[in-house]
Amino acid sequence: MVRLPRKFKRVLLLVVLLTLVVFVRFKKQYIPTISVFEGSLIDNRDTLSYFNISNLEPSERSEWLPNKRVNAAFVTLARNEDLNDLLKSIRKLEKTFNHKYHYGWVFLNNEEFSDEFKEHVIEAVSGKCEFGLVPQEQWSIPEYIDQDKMHENWKKLQELGILYADKESYRHMCRFESGFFYRHPLVQKYEYYWRVEPSVDFFCDLDFDPFAYMKENNKAYAFTITVTEYSETIPSLWPSTKEFIKMHPNALHPNNALNFISNDDGETYNGCHFWTNFEIAKVDFWESEVYSKYFDYLDKSGNFFYERWGDAPVHSIAVSLFADRDNIHFFNEIGYWHPGSGHCPLDDATRAKCDCDPYESIDYNGWSCLDKFYTAFEMPFPENWSFYSH
């Protein structure tokens, strides 16, 4: 047996080690980062160029993502002063979901976004950013509004202790989110949107794409929190809705969810609505003829200003009456918090991916309508629902 000199062995070992180092560095530099593609639908990775997508600028990443990614984006209405609170929302949503998909983001404002705002959010998001301006006519009091009557009504709401009773900007926001956001050119080009607001939190790591779920299951609208509206803010909303239905009886979907929003077959509104600070929906539902007519009818009443109609009851009534109930979805898996209320999943498999406490969830509060949703949609209650609801 031939024995190699000790010096030769050392040289050979050094060559092997150097080869391994070069190979590892080559893989790290040129093989795609697998986490980017987790949960995505990819037919053939050979069509992808072999480099780390994370090294690209955010605006350049979309062309390297799977071509079966849904045509969707996050949509946020925000002010420049919301920057810090919004960055918290963005970072948490990127961490729990979007770092794997790099969906883009549409930011809308009734004023021009500052350079500081743009620079920070572009740095924070993993997809492309688009910034849009709300047209002035969509953020101003219409000429047909009697402003003396409006201010008199605001005083009455103040006496009742209603939140935002005399806030004009809040009413502009509710009116815009009810009937104009989906008409913005930056939003219209997408099939689905996910609404995100400043100061919200996302508790659970998602191992699936909610946009893809919506598309594959033909869902039109999805929510995480459903609660009861303050009746003092919308006294004429249901009467106006009933008048609209009388004028347009064919507007009602034959498989509607009237039994979710009314306890007496439509005579009155029970106040149940989906909290729209989180919603994932199809853009074309709002673009439909029936919803456009409905919003225009409500808008002409002036009660976005005379009263304090919110976009949440407006959206929820419309979805419950004009959409197929089978196309409405509850994303139980998405743990979510908005100042004042939150949703925390109950099932053990999902909770293992979350950092929230079910005891702090609003779902078992008397204000919640989730129990009504389960009943109206004939869905089974979670296994340990009774434990937390007492």
Curated annotation (Swiss-Prot):
Its EC number is 2.4.1.-. Belongs to the glycosyltransferase 15 family. PANTHER family: ALPHA-1,2 MANNOSYLTRANSFERASE KTR1. The active site is at residue 279. It is found in: Endoplasmic reticulum; Golgi apparatus. The keyword Transferase applies. One of its GO terms (cellular component) is endoplasmic reticulum. InterPro entries: Glyco_trans_15 (IPR002685), Nucleotide-diphossugar_trans (IPR029044). The gene is omh1. It is an enzyme of class 2 (transferase). Pfam families: Glyco_transf_15 (PF01793). Keywords: Endoplasmic reticulum, Glycosyltransferase, Golgi apparatus, Transferase. The keyword Membrane does not apply. GO terms for molecular function: alpha-1,2-mannosyltransferase activity. It comes from Schizosaccharomyces pombe (strain 972 / ATCC 24843) (Fission yeast). One of its GO terms (biological process) is protein O-linked glycosylation. Its main location: endoplasmic reticulum. This is O-glycoside alpha-1,2-mannosyltransferase omh1. Mannosyltransferase involved in O-glycosylation of cell wall and secreted proteins. Plays a major role in extending alpha-1,2-linked mannose in the O-glycan pathway.
